[in-house]
């Protein structure tokens, strides 16, 4: 409200989007009473939801890493593991408490394990009965390299940094099943752990799925003006939308689900709504990525800026 003083903000749960009546149904307050809000223009930016049901047990025995709340949950859980590991006399329990498994070797997985490794190093000074050698970190990736979205050079650098930091890397390995204190891998191995963090699996929001909006590959289909197909006054941006991007014929034909693209989409969408109300021609979404960056923790990072690979301290600073 402080950042957007001229905007009416409502903290509520979206129950339904009624495209025929042009309204949104909300549940608000302690009693979750239903309210209808009519719209002239509807902007959908709900993102995607985690889909942990793709692997048996993952949904019930793992943390996700998609929101700030997820990050706080993982942080508090890890501190709790340190607290118990510092005082327990059960060696098997202590080993399990200090085993951390991250599933997924893309941007989210690499950044998660890098930051957790750094955080754990800082925590050690407060827990005298835990040594650095007792901490074990594992990252599991189905592909044959970390950060498969980037070049082999960047992937190899990331691999070498993680190996130096004694992070166990399981490439060309799938997660088969998860139980309450164990993960089972496709290579026949299993890892006992109290901490499983999943950075894989996305699916369309339930609200979007039930609304009748046109979908492709779990995303809302839009035109180049960010309008939902066949619905001129309904707009969609961000991870929940499949938005054409025709800037370069060699580019992937749709916008990738990154914050960099979402910010540009939001700015254009605001202009297009104004243009539509003024009955003027709308502007197409055209944007070329400036690159991608990932933090590896300990003042190291990797990424690609335009055509240049960057790594180490420079990438971390950027």
Question: Where are the regions that the model predicts?
Answer:
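FAD-binding core/adjacent interface of flavoenzyme oxidoreductases
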Residues: 7-99, 197
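Rossmann-like NAD(P)H-binding beta-loop-alpha module
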Residues: 76-132
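Short glycine-rich anion-binding loops that position phosphate/pyrophosphate groups of nucleotides
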Residues: 47-50, 113, 202-204
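FAD-site-proximal beta/loop scaffold in flavoenzymes
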Residues: 60-91, 182, 190-264, 271
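Short, well-ordered coil/turn residues at beta-beta hairpins
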Residues: 27, 45-46, 171-173, 199-200, ...
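C-terminal, flexible cofactor-proximal segment of oxidoreductases
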Residues: 261, 265-318
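A Rossmann-like FAD-binding core segment of flavoenzymes
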Residues: 12-17, 117-224, 228-230
């Amino acid at each position: 409200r402080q950042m957007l003083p001229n905007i009416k903000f409502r903290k509520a749960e979206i129950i339904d989007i009624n495209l025929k009546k042009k309204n949104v149904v909300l549940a608000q307050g302690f009693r979750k009473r239903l309210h209808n809000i009519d719209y002239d223009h509807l902007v959908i930016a709900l993102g995607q939801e985690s889909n942990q049901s793709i692997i048996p047990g993952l949904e019930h025995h793992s943390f996700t890493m998609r929101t700030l709340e997820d990050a706080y949950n993982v942080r508090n859980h890890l501190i709790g593991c340190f607290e118990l590991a510092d005082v327990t006399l059960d060696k098997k329990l202590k080993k399990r408490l200090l085993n951390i498994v991250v599933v997924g070797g893309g941007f989210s997985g690499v950044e998660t394990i890098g930051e957790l490794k750094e955080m754990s190093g800082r925590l050690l000074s407060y827990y005298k009965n835990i040594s650095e050698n007792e901490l074990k970190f594992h990252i599991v990736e189905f592909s044959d390299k970390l950060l498969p979205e980037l070049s082999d050079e960047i992937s190899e650098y990331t691999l070498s940094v993680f190996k130096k930091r004694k992070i166990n890397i399981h490439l060309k390995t799938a997660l088969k099943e998860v139980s309450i204190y164990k993960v089972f891998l496709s290579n026949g191995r299993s890892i006992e752990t109290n901490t499983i963090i999943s950075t894989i699996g996305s699916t369309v929001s339930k609200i979007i799925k039930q609304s009748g909006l046109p979908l492709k590959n779990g995303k809302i289909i839009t035109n180049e003006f960010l309008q939902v197909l066949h619905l001129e006054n309904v707009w969609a941006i961000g991870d929940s939308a499949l938005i054409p991007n025709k800037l370069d014929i060699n580019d992937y034909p749709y916008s990738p689900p990154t914050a960099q693209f979402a910010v540009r989409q939001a700015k254009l969408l605001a202009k297009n709504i104004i243009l539509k109300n003024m009955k003027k021609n709308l502007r197409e979404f055209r944007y070329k990525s400036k690159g991608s960056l990932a933090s590896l923790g300990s003042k190291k990072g990797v990424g690609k800026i335009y055509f240049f690979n960057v790594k180490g301290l420079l990438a971390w600073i950027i």
